[in-house]
Amino acid sequence: MKKDVCIMYRAMSIEIVTYANKSQGMFEELVNNKFVPIKVLGWGTEWKGFTDKIIGVLKYLETKSDTDIIVFIDGFDTKVNKKTDELLNLFQKCQCKVLISRDPELMGGVMSRTIFGTCRGNSIANAGLYMGYVKELKLYLKDTLEPKCKDDQVNFNTSCNKFDFIKVDEDEKIFKNISPRSLNKESNAIFVSYPASPSFSRYTRAFIEYTQFVYIHILCLLVVALVAFPRYKTILVGVTLGLTAFYALAADKSCTL
């Protein structure tokens, strides 16, 4: 398995890294791609949560020069779509220090923005693909660890608005996230990711993590439904009690309480 790359451009280096503690999903295809080697962080470690990735990257950044460029790509959902020859040129054209991929808004625009917020405009930043200079990445990633919220995507968007050196890859020439609804869609981006690929574990995790953002909205709808459709009172009360029990006992509430 190839784990190291250091492509030199003048006085700086560009390094492509991922974080994975095991082989899963598209990992083998990623690390054995024909275009560029990948540096793997976190291999063999115990997975504790999404902040593991950020902590792992930050630790690695301490070994790099401030002017180096690090590209982070998700280890289980991403492929290197083509040669990386134009990577530096495309990044410099963005005129920013940190570039983050655009989220595909899997839950629809309104719901996705309700949960994640936005990054410097109307776009949602996706935490699975990003790149930047080491100096600015350190500032940004450290800030994403400050909130008590455990969701890296929420924190990425919250922190994004604090720094004017960050942009979202609106043109999607470097990064492209493709939703499960558009799997046959072609992309000319260098790095292509397929976040939220269908699996039972992902759906379960999403239900646990994201109920906190929509619980009040759903509860209000259920109350309205009870008033509007009294003949379904037994069913609606059961659903309300079940949802409330799940929220109280199992749902993550770190981002809303």
Where are these regions (language model features)?
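Catalytic core and acceptor-binding pocket of nucleotide-sugar-dependent glycosyltransferases
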Residues: 123-218
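N-terminal anchoring/stem segment of glycosyltransferases
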Residues: 4-69, 216-256
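A conserved hydrophobic position in a structured secondary element of the catalytic/binding core
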Residues: 75, 82, 132
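Short beta-alpha junction loops
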Residues: 22, 44-45, 77, 103-107
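Conserved donor-nucleotide/metal-binding helix-loop-beta segment in metal-dependent transferases, i.e.
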Residues: 79-117
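A generic structural motif
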Residues: 38-47, 100-104, 151-156, 168-175
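Short beta-strand-to-loop acidic/aromatic patch adjacent to the donor-nucleotide binding site
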Residues: 68-76
